[in-house]
């Protein structure tokens, strides 16, 4: 593993913008506090209110100045922005959406990426925006080996592995030759083999298309407060020690779950996976003090 770079794909380029900015600055200022060869491979998410978005519904609107500022924040640091264009209910009429196409045009610089799961949008993006790297989304719920091998043989930059396959030795061995094309979710909080996961994705897609902020979904997992320690109890969890084992087998792309989670969940995930054990307290203090300073500054600005 010593010579291999490990790429981490982080959540919430818009929603967790401040946290991600603090993290990037700390990685630059205190590189010895972070695990060697660990890099930010991308930051995924959506701008507010984009109907192409899937996975987690996000409402509102992001103005053009903020769109440009956020793209610049990451791209100037060499970090790709990855759009979660995974709405599973998209039809051809939706691909011409003015707002989503505006976002794509602003981000079309050869660096940024798109997660996809609908052929109608994927084909449109390949035609209209060939400069974007396309990633096959875990929202497709490909849980069979044959389907996964077929997906890996398609023209995708990466394929995100379904979390239920994280420790499936038959699958991991079979895809070993294409390990560098696989992205693995390390801290999924969803129950193993969740029978409602695909239905939940569809419900979130419908919420996004209809701007239905009040729609509810009967998920027993949503009744609990989300804490990072909870994901450690899941069979799909991959520990920081196991990351090295996966990397030795050629798997070098890892995704940290966090969309729709509290900031503390995401912050603890970053501290656990990216920071060296003996530096965690120091980086935690730096991170929290900086976030508090920003929060105080925002309060004064609003007063």
Q: What is the meaning of each model-derived region?
A:
Residues 2-147, 156-303:
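Active-site pocket-lining/capping segments in soluble small-molecule metabolic enzymes
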């Amino acid at each position: 593993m010593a010579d291999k770079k490990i790429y981490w794909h982080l959540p919430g380029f818009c929603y967790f913008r401040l946290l991600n900015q603090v993290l990037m600055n700390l990685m630059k200022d205190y590189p010895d506090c972070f695990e060697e060869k660990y890099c930010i491979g991308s930051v995924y998410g959506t701008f507010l209110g984009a109907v192409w978005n899937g996975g987690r519904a996000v409402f509102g609107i992001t103005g053009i100045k903020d769109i440009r500022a956020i793209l610049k924040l990451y791209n100037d640091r060499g970090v790709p922005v990855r759009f979660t264009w995974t709405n599973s209910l998209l039809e051809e009429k939706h691909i011409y959406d003015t707002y989503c196409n505006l976002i794509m045009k602003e981000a079309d610089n050869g660096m940024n990426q798109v997660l996809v799961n609908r052929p109608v949008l994927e084909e449109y993006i390949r035609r209209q925006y060939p400069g974007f790297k396309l990633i096959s989304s875990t929202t497709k719920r490909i849980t069979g080996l044959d389907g996964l091998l077929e997906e890996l043989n398609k023209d995708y930059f990466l394929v995100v592995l379904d979390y239920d396959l994280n420790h499936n030795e038959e699958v991991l061995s079979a895809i070993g030759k294409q390990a560098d094309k696989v992205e693995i979710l390390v801290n999924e909080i969803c129950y193993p083999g969740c029978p409602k996961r695909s239905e939940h994705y569809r419900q979130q897609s419908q919420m996004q298309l209809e701007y239905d902020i009040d729609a509810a979904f009967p998920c027993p997992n949503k009744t609990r407060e989300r804490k990072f320690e909870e994901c450690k109890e899941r069979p799909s969890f991959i520990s920081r020690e196991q990351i090295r084992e996966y990397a030795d087998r050629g798997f070098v792309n890892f995704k940290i779950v966090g969309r729709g989670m509290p900031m503390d969940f995401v912050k603890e995930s970053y501290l656990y996976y990216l920071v060296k054990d003996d530096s965690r307290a120091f980086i935690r203090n730096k991170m929290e003090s900086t976030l508090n300073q920003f929060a105080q500054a925002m309060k004064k600005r609003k007063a």
